[in-house]
Regions:
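Polycationic, low-complexity disordered segments in secreted or periplasmic proteins
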Residues: 190-213
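A composition/secondary-structure signal for short, hydrophobic, low-basic-content segments
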Residues: 49-50, 84, 188-190, 203
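Asp/Glu-rich intrinsically disordered low-complexity tracts
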Residues: 178, 184, 194-197
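Metal-dependent phosphoester/phosphodiester hydrolase catalytic core
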Residues: 1-122, 132-136, 144-178, 182
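Small-residue (glycine/proline)-centered packing/hinge motifs flanked by hydrophobic/aromatic residues
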Residues: 124-127
């Protein structure tokens, strides 16, 4: 993960099938890291964009969460991640805001980024939560991301410049909780008492010196 301006970008490894034999706890470890990383970003007042290859649902879509969805989506919900980019299916799809794997008024928008190379895939299907779905079988495509003060503006275009989709995703910076100085009257009184005690000791010593004279 890294910061660029006011945005915190997180790149997740979702190739658990290829790595499971070598590191069976990969998803648990990555989810634990992600929890800490998003907490730090929230504390720093950063907006978040997540990048991951596999979508959080099975491919082709069958209504079930993929393994990475089971581990990562609860954390996206917990930290109010506004935008997640995925790939894998070589199609473009943009969901409504998602919370608890359900359409919601406020939640995470998931965008499948289409294809940039020559390979298309006719096995992808439109999800019930997709606002826009497009399978770029005719030519490659690309996306642009424009960061605005209170939103992320995403545009999807074909290589010839034809606009496929454009959307503004609400993305206000999280409110950073500041700890105000607490007035500890006890500590103040204690400090004042210590000052008085020191003055009393000095006065007592001075009186003893005068008596000795």
């Amino acid at each position: 993960s890294f910061d660029y301006g006011a945005v915190h970008y997180v790149s997740l490894n979702t190739d658990y099938e290829e790595l499971n034999g070598w590191r069976p706890t990969m998803m648990e470890d990555e989810a634990a890291w992600l929890d800490k990383d998003l907490a730090a970003a929230q504390k720093a007042g950063k907006r978040v964009v997540v990048l991951m290859h596999r979508p959080p649902w099975d491919s082709p879509y069958d209504g079930q969460l993929d393994v990475n969805g089971k581990y990562f989506m609860p954390l996206f919900d917990k930290y109010n991640v506004p935008l997640v980019f995925t790939a894998h299916e070589h199609c473009y799809g943009r969901t409504v805001p998602i919370k608890n794997d359900q359409a919601a008024t406020e939640g995470t928008v998931y965008i499948a980024t289409g294809r940039s190379g020559t390979e298309s895939w006719d096995g992808s299907v439109k999800k019930p939560t997709d606002v826009v779905y497009y399978n770029p079988t005719d030519m490659p495509m690309y996306l642009t991301l424009q960061v605005e003060p209170d939103e992320f503006r995403v545009s999807a275009l074909k290589n010839d410049g034809t606009l496929i989709d454009t959307v503004s995703v609400p993305a206000k910076a999280p409110v950073v909780k500041t700890t105000e100085a607490v007035k500890d009257t006890g500590a103040v009184q204690s400090g004042q008492k210590q000052k008085k005690d020191k003055k009393a000791v000095k006065k007592s010593k001075k009186q003893k010196v005068n008596k000795n004279k």
